[in-house]
């Protein structure tokens, strides 16, 4: 189908284009960008007046729970949630059942995603077999099957020597290592940040050092091996500081922040609500400020969701018993715009870079770029619309969000992937 997006404000970090223009899509590619392109060239015209036209968002960190936990989410519902959130590419984490530690699981996920005809799904491979931290997985085989990166997400590889071997293999194969930074020996049953709020609620806490010591270790190993390190869901002020210093020293490191970590602090927890239980936990206002400033200053380059759906039954338990995790695909863009763009931390161009261009550069895919000849992966975002988040409208199976009822300004209106409209609330 030939689609003409009319009158939108095109924001393209790859070229720094920042102006009102029309975008013509044909044969799954961007065909033309220009002023007043003739409508007769298109089979479908989408009026994007007053909206941003950005490269389709890329989420480097989601959990689609498939295979093994399809009661929480499956590839099809996960893709729909992603499309509703403006995402055209996502990286799914390997902590499934069975673990994505071999080419067969990589192929299963990719083939199932392709059959859904929605968005691009790239399965990340595990670092170790079964995520047991004892023996390296078949990393080369998974890369040949299309895995763009490796990760032990959900935990850290605590054996530093083994992890170093994994980093060396990743460096040899030219793929990044996505690091979940958590010293499991220091968690000690903690369920939220170790601060005054934890004491008030009578809950065991997780200190910042649980994250910080592994961030430090992994940066040192990246420097030692030359591997490309990407730090997942950073939550502490010292993580930001260490990334800054590492970059200044030439270490190949990048880092992501999740919307819940730059939006909420433990001060927002009025009670022991498991929708506020995620890993890493919400931190203090001081940490939130550091994360926002890190994104503003380009130290932290990526905004990812760590989309982690659970059933109502899973979350309808005590803080000690309920699993960690919240959904995020359908709230990330509006929260980023509401908290960071309107909050004065990011420009719309920086928002697009953090949510599309930078992830594409880190994982080495030719996306995150709206110009002729590039893939027609596009999101149309209305920066003016104000509404309340309603979890009951989510396409995801998960309803586990602390943002239900929150008023935000900025909404995804249309998502186009490979030249096909996969979500649309415009021109109805």
Model-predicted segments: where are they?
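Divalent metal-coordination and catalytic microenvironments
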Residues: 8, 23, 28, 50, ...
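Alpha-helix-loop-beta-strand connector modules within alpha/beta enzyme cores
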Residues: 103-120, 168-179
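His/Asp/Glu-enriched, well-ordered alpha-helical/loop segment
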Residues: 200-228, 275, 296-303, 308-383
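Histidine-rich, glycine-flanked metal-binding segment
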Residues: 1-55
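C-terminal cap of metal-dependent C-N hydrolases
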Residues: 318-321, 375-428
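Metal-associated gating/positioning segment near the N- to mid-region
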Residues: 48-113
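Active-site mouth loops of central-metabolism enzymes
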Residues: 60-73, 96, 122-135, 204-208
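Histidine/acidic residue-rich metal-binding segments in metalloenzymes
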Residues: 134-303
């Amino acid at each position: 189908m030939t689609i003409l997006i009319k009158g939108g404000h095109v924001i393209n970090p790859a070229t720094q284009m920042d102006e009102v223009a029309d975008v013509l899509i044909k044969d799954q590619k961007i065909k033309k960008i220009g002023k007043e392109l003739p409508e007769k060239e298109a089979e479908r015209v989408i009026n994007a007046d007053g909206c941003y036209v950005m490269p389709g968002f890329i989420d480097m960190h989601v959990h689609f729970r498939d295979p093994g936990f399809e009661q929480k989410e499956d590839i099809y519902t996960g893709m729909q949630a992603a499309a509703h959130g403006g995402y055209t590419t996502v990286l799914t984490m390997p902590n499934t059942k069975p673990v994505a530690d071999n080419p067969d699981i990589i192929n299963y996920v990719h083939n199932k995603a392709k059959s859904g005809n929605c968005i691009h799904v790239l399965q990340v491979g595990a670092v170790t077999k079964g995520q047991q931290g004892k023996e390296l997985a078949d990393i080369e085989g998974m890369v040949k099957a299309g895995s763009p990166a490796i990760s032990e997400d959900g935990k850290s590889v605590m054996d530093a020597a083994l992890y170093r071997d994994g980093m060396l293999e990743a460096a040899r194969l030219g793929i990044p290592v996505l690091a979940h930074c958590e010293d499991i020996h220091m968690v000690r049953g903690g369920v939220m940040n170790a601060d005054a709020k934890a004491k008030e609620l009578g809950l065991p806490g997780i200190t910042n050092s649980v994250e910080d010591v592994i961030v430090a270790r992994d940066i040192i190993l990246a420097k030692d091996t030359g591997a490309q390190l990407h730090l997942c869901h950073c939550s502490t002020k010292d993580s930001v500081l260490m990334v800054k210093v590492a970059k200044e020293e030439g270490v190949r490191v990048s880092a992501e922040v999740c919307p819940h970590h730059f939006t909420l602090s433990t001060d927002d927890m009025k009670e022991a609500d498991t929708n506020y239980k995620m890993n890493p936990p919400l931190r203090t206002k001081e940490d939130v400020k550091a994360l926002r400033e890190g994104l503003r200053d380009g130290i932290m380059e990526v905004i990812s969701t760590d989309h982690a759906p659970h059933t109502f039954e899973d979350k309808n338990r005590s803080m000690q018993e309920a699993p960690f995790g919240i959904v995020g695909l359908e709230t990330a863009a509006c929260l980023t715009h509401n908290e960071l763009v309107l909050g004065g931390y990011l420009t719309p161009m920086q928002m697009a870079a953090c949510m599309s261009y930078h992830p594409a550069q880190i994982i080495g895919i030719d996306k995150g770029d709206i110009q002729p000849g590039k893939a027609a992966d596009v999101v149309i975002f209305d920066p003016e619309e104000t509404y309340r988040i309603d979890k009951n409208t989510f396409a995801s199976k998960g309803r586990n969000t602390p943002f239900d009822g929150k008023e935000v300004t900025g909404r995804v209106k249309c998502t186009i992937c490979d030249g096909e409209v996969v979500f649309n609330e415009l021109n109805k």
